[in-house]
Amino acid sequence: MAATDAALRQAQGDTGLRRKYEAVIGIECHVELKTTSKMFCGCPNEFGGEPNTKVCPVCLALPGALPVPNAKAIELMIAAGLAFDAEIPAFSKFDRKNYFYPDMPKDYQISQFDMPLTQGGVVHYWLPDGTKKSCRLTRIHLEEDTGKSTHAGSGDGRIAGSSYSLVDFNRAGVPLMECVGEPDIRSADEAVGYLEALKRTFVELGVSDVKMEEGSLRCDANVSVRLFGAPEYGTKAEIKNMNSFRSVHDAIESEIDRQIAVIEGGGRVIQETRGWDEAAGVTHSMRSKEQAHDYRYFPEPDLVPLELDRAVVERIRAAMPPVPFERFERYTEKFGISVKQTTQLVDNPALAGYFDRVVTITNAPVATLNFVLGDLSRLANESGTAVIAGKVTPEALAELIALTEAKTINSKIAKDVLARLWADGGSAKSIVEGEGLAQVSDPGAIAKFVDDVLAANAESVTQFKAGKENVLKFLVGQVMKTSRGKANPELVEALLREQIAAR
Amino acid sequence: MATERIDVRGVARLARLALSDEEIERYGAQLEDLLKHVDDLKQLDTSDVAATAQVIESRNVMRPDVLVPCLDHDVVMAGAPQPQHGFFRVPKIIAEVG
Amino acid sequence: MDPVRASAREIARAVNAREVSAVEIAETMIPHVAAVDEHLGAYLTLTPDLMREHARRVDARIAAGESLPLAGVPAAIKDNMCLLGTRTTCASKILEHWIAPYTGTAVERLLAAGALPIGKTNMDEFAMGSSGENSALGKTKNPYDLDRVPGGSSAGSAAAVGGFAATISTGSDTGGSIREPAAFCNVVGFKPTYGRVSRYGLIAFASSLDQIGPFARTVEDAALTYDAMGGHDPMDATSVDMPFETTAGHLREDLRGVRVGIVKEFATSDLAPDVAAAYEAAYADLQKLGAELVEVELPTAKYGLSTYYLIAPAECSSNLARFDGVRYGLRVDGADVGEMYEKTRAAGFGPEVKRRILIGTYALSSGYYDAYYVKAQKARTRIADDFRRAFATCDVIASPAASSPAFAFNAKSDPYSMYLMDYYTIPVSLAGLPSLSIPCGSALPEGGSRPMPLGLQLASPLFSERALLGYAHAYERATQHAIKLTPDPHCHPELVEGPR
């Protein structure tokens, strides 16, 4: 029985109900692999273009054509599996999944049924507040993408109500990873965290662009609810048609509310497929009657099995960069960096790699972070170049940071030197020594500057003594000016206070 | 094995073949006849053999990830039963053509 | 040299030696074939312009100093093989007007070796059949008796060569579709080991069984043709990446030291008396050539038909799904795409094709997959094992290619009786072994008035093509059965165009 509007509204506003019911969510993703050519032929694996211009006898399924698997796709799959600690079996094969659909050129899809390229695995991820979570993977397998249908004649591009469809096979045959997650996820936020972890990892590995808006990541969510403490899972509904992480979040939230409302209203959740309607903010049932597919899986006779040599797997593992979660843990727990800044870094793997190299030398993660995310990124943004494409090598930055940490130069000078390094490259040490930019920390010298400034600013001294604290800033600034920026600002401040007190 | 009646209509639907009632009867009878013959496989002991996947022993046959020229668009569309604006047009898809 | 009667070897030698041009060969064959085919019906499409174009190219290459193994040899191509720009129909209404936009590898290699494409030959629809009668687009007759079937599924390719309307031709063999029509049409028909010849461009029937192979009037010609077509192809993942052993020029001339296995379960006593006698004589001839006859057992061969008629239909039900009216071929419109599929396929496929799609879909369907498809694949392993054991005691197995000579049209209306025509060839196919049929005499068929050809099937271990063709060559050299029979007057080379 469908939830009444009132019940739904009540559920949506009622956090008490959310405490009563536990949501159980399993995510299934299809991720297009970033190869040059398609999975079984040499046509380009590229988004966009005029329809039916990137096809050949194989991906168009002309009579007589035969598939040959893309070695790179297999390698990327293995890397993806290893990134999540999945098991890479010794033996794998392809199977045919038989069903008819206009965007399926062969009317079967070459996929993997009982011997996928990876088994198991765990996706570790984090929530915005830094809580660590994990979701087990059932498997990741390799298959080929379908063509794309556009539905015409209904006015809104949806299938229902359309009078005909137009099919483009440019996408047919693009290699696809199907990632099936266990139902370990318990909230919409977790679902998004999980997806972000997948995305970050795949982008870092170069396995996929993972752009939902371009279709290189598509996902469905299986959602069910049960009373907290109940031993059995509730009936699940499969949610489709979510086009962004935001949609995934909202759709899951909406579906949880709907299911709770149904149950609270005395009804039962039906196992069905439901489509997310972004505009209306609800899910709609997509099937009038449940029809089980008989895919008639059988081993693909046009392909031979894969025997995955352990040495090859190890070679792939050795060449992989660290996974984002590893970075997350290291940055937040070992380095004490905030979740927000960690996320910022992790989302930019190139920058994170740069950061890691600098920290290896400086052993000063916080200071390094401040430079990297602060002034260095600012310089990079202003010039429209990425940090790693710029002239400041990790070694040069590390040198600059070392000079700052040793208090050889002050922060203002450091800023200037950084700007010089960004513009011309080179070494911080050379610049500082060459131009005598070293911070003046000799108390005697500073005392002289302080004397001069106090002498010239008697009213300020009076104002400070009268309680105006911020006058000190002005005075520090004056001393810095007099010393051409080289005085050690902390010493300056300390001496100023001392001297004023003595006057 | 083949003792119950075959659901020829169901099989025909899976195979996307429109069959008349007469054809359902006729093919049904012929299929059942074949299955009676095929029943002799029950007598063959296959408990200790693996299914043949391929008669050849090849493994790991793959291709490098390089581009190969595509078919010319005009050639592709020349064979299309109903080309439209460079697409293949098909009648409306009823949501679950599963 | 008379191009109609000459062997491929003779034609190639003469063209390479510039004694005759490929264009002259083409210009002789084109009218000849057109005239013969009025009666024979071997071809669905004749390609005279293409033949001339290839002839010109061959002559140019010869003039530039090249030597081509099949220079100027007139070749017929079975119509389930894609040849760029030609109608490629599989003898089905569903592809009746389809023009192939590419050429398959084996055909490409054949033409690159200098062969001239005469046209595309008739066949049983989608290679499903053993008589040629399942063609939806034409009727091919046996060149030795126009009232009898040529065999199938490579009906036209066998008939063309047997009827002197081609020097060589390509066929495909899944359960016997080269060997059986070769036997019926008095020619050599050779199926290589599975994986030896690329399947890229061969419209698939049963992927794990299909192989392309040659028809010719001599073993040597068959060897030359196979050598041109065979070898690894990166476009076919099932083509074997092994050094290719050429066969022509390495053919032995006797059978001394060769152990020929005679299969206990294929007793000639199962056959009609004069057919049995012919085979017994053939076995005796093998002995006269120095072979030792050895009895071998293939206890599971009797399960071959059941095994085959589960595996092949299962694979074909999937392979033929792509014929859906969306991208090419016949389309019959419907109110929605589902109706379009059903009506298109109902109109486009003939009865035998529908039968096999139905049985194949059933064998793969949920609840039946293990009992049928998996069981059959296990039975296949047992059959292959039997052959392996047999080859421990013999080098080659000899048997009838078919249980009778060519039968009359409409003689086998019951599907299963037709399936029985492949009884001897199917087990060999299931094991993937190289195998051929070579003319071994004749017998009067039931109700017939003239003797019809018989074929001896030889099968040898995997990848032993050179040895196999050698055994056949030795047998042919000593017995020369093919030339003892005269084709129908409409096909006899002497009588068609007069002296040359």
Located regions from the model:
Chain C
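An N-terminal boundary/leader segment
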Residues: 1-52, 288-289, 362, 484-492, ...
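Structural helix-boundary/capping segments
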Residues: 35, 108, 163-169, 174-272, ...
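Residue-level signal for inorganic ion chemistry
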Residues: 29, 51, 103, 222, ...
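Long amphipathic alpha-helix in the N-terminal Rossmann-like dinucleotide-binding domain
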Residues: 49-56, 114-115, 124
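Acyltransferase
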Residues: 22-27, 56-59, 247, 271-297, ...
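Serine-dependent amide/ester hydrolase catalytic core
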Residues: 12-13, 300-304, 322-430, 486
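Immediate post-signal peptide segment of exported/extracytoplasmic ligand-binding proteins
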Residues: 58-74, 221, 251-261
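Short glycine/serine-rich loop/turn segments
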Residues: 70-212, 265, 313-314, 399-416
